[in-house]
């Protein structure tokens, strides 16, 4: 099948969540065969910011679901949403 690039929007539990620390904790729970290709912080509203990650997903069974479930279980994560799927460039 090859690699797929999934852009994921991770919403923190609050405005005081350290997004750099959150990114490190998310990297630590990545399933085998997945890797982070890029990241950025996106302002949402009223001081709240989201962490956007581009995750390369290889031939993982279940596609992006194992990554979404792993990210959602990390303390400090309010929600995980896949916003875009495509081939890495």
UniProtKB/Swiss-Prot annotation:
Q: Known InterPro entries for this protein?
A: eEF-1beta-like_sf (IPR036219), EF1B_bsu/dsu_GNE (IPR014038), Transl_elong_EF1B/ribsomal_bS6 (IPR014717), Transl_elong_EF1B_B_arc (IPR004542)
Keywords recorded for this protein, A-Z: Elongation factor, Protein biosynthesis
Its family remark reads:
Belongs to the EF-1-beta/EF-1-delta family.
Q: Which gene encodes it?
A: ef1b
What species does this protein belong to?
Answer: Methanococcoides burtonii (strain DSM 6242 / NBRC 107633 / OCM 468 / ACE-M)
Pfam families according to UniProt = EF1_GNE (PF00736)
| Protein name (Swiss-Prot/TrEMBL) | Elongation factor 1-beta
Q: Which SMART domains match?
A: EF1_GNE
Q: Which CDD domains match?
A: EF1B
A single GO molecular function term of this UniProt record? translation elongation factor activity
PANTHER family associated with the record? ELONGATION FACTOR 1-BETA
What is the role of this chain? Promotes the exchange of GDP for GTP in EF-1-alpha/GDP, thus allowing the regeneration of EF-1-alpha/GTP that could then be used to form the ternary complex EF-1-alpha/GTP/AAtRNA.
**Keyword Isomerase, does the record have it?**
no
């Amino acid at each position: 099948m090859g690699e797929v690039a999934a852009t994921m929007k991770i919403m923190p539990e609050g405005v005081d969540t350290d997004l750099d620390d959150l990114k490190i904790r998310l990297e630590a729970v990545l399933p085998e065969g997945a890797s982070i290709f890029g990241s950025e912080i996106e302002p949402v509203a009223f001081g709240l910011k989201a962490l956007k990650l581009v995750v390369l997903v290889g031939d993982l069974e279940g596609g992006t679901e194992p990554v979404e479930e792993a990210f959602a279980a990390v303390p400090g994560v309010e929600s995980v949403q896949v916003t875009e799927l495509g081939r890495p460039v």
